[in-house]
Design a protein with these regions (language model features):
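Mid-domain Rossmann-like dinucleotide-binding core that forms the NAD(H)/NADP(H) cofactor-binding site
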Residues: 129-200
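N-terminal glycine-rich beta->alpha transition that marks the start or flank
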Residues: 11-13, 20-73
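A glycine-/small-residue-rich N-terminal strand-loop-strand element
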Residues: 71-98
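Glycine-rich phosphate-binding loop and adjacent beta-alpha segment
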Residues: 224-296, 330
Length: 330
């Protein structure tokens, strides 16, 4: 089969189309013919960062091929002997083996049955693939952690991005008042998602205008800020939140001092949110499937590439300015 192999850590050009063996499934896995693949900023981070490759991809050192990616939608073509959930021909999607080796940049993948769900018939493979890691992250941030409810005032940074555009839609689904923050070029797009207000981060500081938000979903990607300090965007976000509010960080890891200070000064709860394996993963992705099927959330696809153009897709995703999702089709 064809797959995109990472030849060495570095630039997008190190992602090479190659012939590799078809994966062999375990008893609890299904073989999926991949119809669509979604990529995320973390993909580019892992591609160019040895430590991230070792931690997030769980590099062992004896891999015949390093194949990145975690988000797919496709058709089940073979089932393991212990599989009871799926049968050949089922259309499925999911974010699987994260953290670990999903090897999703390929024509076929071997995936654990417990990390996939049935794709709704009225949802395309491309839209379903997009709504995996990104939509799950938005769900984890707003629903699981922040417990979003009707009339909550929510600020969503990065509202035009992969996670952000789902976050706006999920927040509106629950009846929240949404303030979207993104580049001014994307104002119409963000308001079109349902946001009630918009701020252009290039010309406006949200903290100069708002100090009573119930929830802030902060997805500003600053790789230098591994831990939060008073100089980070995360610290600025605290200024927009009312006493007793919630700060959900998607990228920056807030250190304990930052967390304790926010709690002591304004009773603000701060947490780093991600979609690493957890007990509610299956229910969460089922909820996403239901929202997709009902049209409550939609995947905006800004770029659609053939698998062979993975390097081009990475060039775009690593700018962190992509609108909505980037999808590839084998």
């Amino acid at each position: 089969m064809k797959a995109i192999v990472l030849k060495e850590i570095g630039s997008p050009e190190n992602l090479i189309l190659a012939e590799v063996p078809l994966p062999k499934i375990k008893d609890n896995e299904v073989l999926v013919q991949v119809k669509a693949i979604a990529i995320n900023p973390v993909d580019a981070f892992v591609r160019r960062n040895q430590a991230a490759l070792e931690m997030i991809y769980a590099l062992k050192g004896d891999e015949e091929n390093i194949i990145l990616g975690w988000d797919v939608a496709g058709i089940v073509t073979e089932v393991g002997s212990a599989v009871t959930k799926f049968k050949t021909g089922d259309e499925v999607f999911g974010n699987f083996n994260f953290i670990g080796q999903a090897n999703a940049y390929a024509e076929f993948v071997a995936a654990p049955e417990e990390e996939l769900v049935i794709k709704p018939a009225n949802v395309s493979f491309e839209a379903a693939a997009g709504a995996t890691m990104a939509a799950l992250t938005a769900w984890a941030s707003l629903v699981k952690f922040a417990k979003v409810k009707k009339d909550d005032k929510i600020i969503i940074y990065g509202a035009s991005g992969g996670v952000g555009h789902y976050a706006v839609q999920i927040a509106k689904h629950f009846g929240a008042y949404v303030i979207g923050v993104a580049s001014g070029d994307n104002k119409d797009f963000v308001l079109g998602l349902g946001a009630d207000e918009f701020f252009d981060y290039k010309t406006q500081k949200v903290e100069d205008f708002i100090n009573d938000a119930d929830i802030v979903h902060d997805a500003v990607w600053v790789e230098a800020d591994v831990n939060s300090t008073e100089d980070t965007h995360l610290a600025r976000s605290l200024k927009t939140i009312k006493k007793g509010g919630i700060l959900s960080s998607i990228v920056v890891y807030p250190d304990q001092q930052f967390i304790d200070k926010a709690k002591a000064e304004k009773n603000i709860t701060v947490q780093r949110v991600n979609v690493t394996p957890n007990d509610s993963y299956l229910k969460d992705i089922e909820n996403i499937a239901e929202l997709l099927s009902a049209g409550e959330i939609k995947t905006h696809i800004s770029h659609l590439f053939p698998l062979a153009d993975m390097a081009k897709a990475h060039e775009i995703i690593q700018t962190k300015n992509a609108v909505g999702k980037i999808i590839l089709v084998p």
